[in-house]
Amino acid sequence: MQEGGFIRRRRTRSTKKSVNYNELSDDDTAVKNSKTLQLKGNSENVNDSQDEEYRDDATLVKSPDDDDKDFIIDLTGSDKERTATDENTHAIKNDNDEIIEIKEERDVSDDDEPLTKKRKTTARKKKKKTSTKKKSPKVTPYERNTLRLYEHHPELRNVFTDLKNAPPYVPQRSKQPDGMTIKLLPFQLEGLHWLISQEESIYAGGVLADEMGMGKTIQTIALLMNDLTKSPSLVVAPTVALMQWKNEIEQHTKGQLKIYIYHGASRTTDIKDLQGYDVVLTTYAVLESVFRKQNYGFRRKNGLFKQPSVLHNIDFYRVILDEAHNIKDRQSNTARAVNNLKTQKRWCLSGTPLQNRIGEMYSLIRFLNINPFTKYFCTKCDCASKDWKFTDRMHCDHCSHVIMQHTNFFNHFMLKNIQKFGVEGPGLESFNNIQTLLKNIMLRRTKVERADDLGLPPRIVTVRRDFFNEEEKDLYRSLYTDSKRKYNSFVEEGVVLNNYANIFTLITRMRQLADHPDLVLKRLNNFPGDDIGVVICQLCNDEAEEPIESKCHHKFCRLCIKEYVESFMENNNKLTCPVCHIGLSIDLSQPALEVDLDSFKKQSIVSRLNMSGKWQSSTKIEALVEELYKLRSNKRTIKSIVFSQFTSMLDLVEWRLKRAGFQTVKLQGSMSPTQRDETIKYFMNNIQCEVFLVSLKAGGVALNLCEASQVFILDPWWNPSVEWQSGDRVHRIGQYRPVKITRFCIEDSIEARIIELQEKKANMIHATINQDEAAISRLTPADLQFLFNN
């Protein structure tokens, strides 16, 4: 820098206040409240140590009076403003208001650019003028994929418009089918007309979703009788309902339909033989088994063998799924087995087509084969397929585009928005689309809507409350104190959900003790898990009802493990086995394990207890005996059904009732279909048989027990729908007597809390649009805390 040139020093390591010359008034051409600035004429006077700290092009010398305060002159004004008094003179005002004039004496060379040019790099940017043009809204990924789908698949544009414009269903009554011995009710004739018209429509089937107990089976049999030339028909039903289908077909058709039960080890393997029948009856378990053996094979000592499935190699005229929610999991082997059947007409019968979430409806729609809702569409080309085929797990087998470029119609247009927005905005539109579809493929009537046609008698529900005796009270308080201590330790460690199985066991033991102390005490002293022929559920510690096995070889009641699995929904905890705590892998629809019934009876709790004169009954059992004595009459026999979730409790009740002079029969999950049928027939036809003991896990659904009019539920459960279904076994078409349902509850026990929890969950069911039964079945951490605070 030339001698005599203007030197300004600027600190670069800290943030300083700046003054803009443009903001100074004409009188104040100097910076106010600043320290005396000493400006030196040449760079030789600058200390070497300061040169390292400051930049060479400008140097600021601070006042010795205040080393902690820096001041910077921000030279951002124009040269004209800066040289108002003199072209080469600058004025700075010090603390004493003295004007200091500084002259610059240097020649401007080519190498020495004016300050204004040097300031260009630090000059403030001018604000950009806002555009007055309105920007178009940003396209979301969902909208982008929708546009791409419409571009490559233009037929999708009018799917919902066509559904909305379809003519609404107008109820009409069909004529009574020839050959039926039972006269159909008016609403059932309307149902028959709808069934016939649906088979002739583009849907070739649908969902009959009448409420439980309104005669879905009878209406379906009427459809079979409408045209006897249209056969064969396949009916897939739960094991407990198999014989009921056979009996009702034989009873109401005068034997005009030829029936074959495809069940058991002696079932036929001849396709021509099956084609000669009008109706083939089978179970979901058998259908899944033959499908698995055909596609995946089965192991023997000599290797892996595959066996063709007779059911999957016959062209049926129609396939009917009873209790169709059994295929609600579209990824289950049972759903795959059903979807691979060959048929022209497809039907789903279910009083609860939606149990857990709306997505489960897709499995039924997929079985019904309703296009385009079941197809996967490519957003890059016109590829469309019902099957998800990506052999290399990356590229489509049909068009070679990647997975992310394919989407399912039902998922894209009907589920995504509901999952994201609920039933508001775009979610409400998707929800309305689902309702529009269901109006075209589903018929649902309730008992309240058709009360005049049904003519059902009133149903009364009461709760009988009793108290422990002194001995039971001491035992319960001891067990409760120990259980609460363990539960509190889980809460303190923050591992409640990780120990759901352990907490489930604690609750189960308290529930069992409220039934009878022996259910807990003898279980702790003599656990029969290794007894031959007996399968013990490792969740409820009772004889397993419909036992199924996990891949880690642990056995559970089908209902117990189902509720356990559902408890992990909507949280991030890993689903683990409740016994060994490794990742749980289990098929909830697999066939039940075979149980030796004779060994089962030998190992019942009665055979393990000393049932001599020293045996003591319980408060609850004696309360049941008292209620049954009240029903006895010399004029008529009033039949009753007793439900319990614990087969050991039913064993004790059976022994006590026989001692009291009551004739009983018992239905258990270990029975074969034939044994179940014989037991039900004996109860219905034998006047002397007064009490039917039923395991809630085995007989809660698909039973018609309208011969009884009294229902006793011994142990309450937190899912109220379980008890509602048990009541529907009696309060249904064919019932002409008032129905009374009595629920037993021991006060000052966990049962009182469960009753309160039931009421809370029942209110939630009636208050919500989407009845999410999975949420009802689950015990949340708040529910667990509620149960342990009695």
UniProtKB/Swiss-Prot annotation:
Motif DEAH box per record, residues: 322-325
What else the UniProt entry mentions is: Present with 358 molecules/cell in log phase SD medium.
Q: Note the CDD domains from the entry.
A: DEXDc_SHPRH-like, RING-HC_RAD16-like, SF2_C_SNF
GO BP terms, alphabetized: global genome nucleotide-excision repair; nucleotide-excision repair; nucleotide-excision repair, DNA damage recognition; protein localization; response to UV; ubiquitin-dependent protein catabolic process
List all disulphide bridges recorded for this chain. Answer: none
Query: By which gene is this protein encoded?
Result: RAD16
Q: Name one GO cellular component term.
A: nucleotide-excision repair factor 4 complex
The yes or no answer to whether the keyword Hydrolase is present is: yes
* Residues given in the record as ATP binding sites: D210, E211, M212, G213, M214, G215, K216, T217
Which protein family is it in?
Belongs to the SNF2/RAD54 helicase family.
Q: Where does this protein have compositionally biased stretches of type Basic and acidic residues? A: 77-106
Q: How does it assemble?
A: Component of the global genome repair (GGR) complex composed of at least ABF1, RAD7 and RAD16. Interacts with ELC1.
Task: Report the protein's function.
Answer: Component of the global genome repair (GGR) complex which promotes global genome nucleotide excision repair (GG-NER) which removes DNA damage from nontranscribing DNA. Involved in differential repair of DNA after UV damage. Will repair preferentially the MAT-alpha locus compared with the HML-alpha locus.
Annotated region (Disordered), positions in chain: 1-141
Q: What broad class describes the main subcellular location of this protein? A: nucleus
* Polar residues: bias regions: 31-48
The protein's name is DNA repair protein RAD16
| Helicase C-terminal domain ranges (all copies) | 623-777
The zinc fingers classed as RING-type run over 537-581
Reported EC number(s) for this entry are 3.6.4.-
Matching PROSITE patterns, A to Z? HELICASE_ATP_BIND_1, HELICASE_CTER, ZF_RING_1, ZF_RING_2
Q: Which residues carry this modification: Phosphoserine?
A: S25, S109
Report domain Helicase ATP-binding positions: 197-371
Keywords annotated in UniProt: ATP-binding, DNA damage, DNA repair, DNA-binding, Helicase, Hydrolase, Metal-binding, Nucleotide-binding, Nucleus, Phosphoprotein, Zinc, Zinc-finger
Q: Does the keyword Ligase apply?
A: no
Q: Which GO terms describe its molecular function?
A: ATP binding; DNA binding; helicase activity; hydrolase activity; zinc ion binding
InterPro entries with a match to the protein in the record = Helicase_ATP-bd, Helicase_C-like, P-loop_NTPase, SNF2-like_sf, SNF2/RAD54-like_C, SNF2_N, SNF2_RAD54_helicase_TF, Znf_C3HC4_RING-type
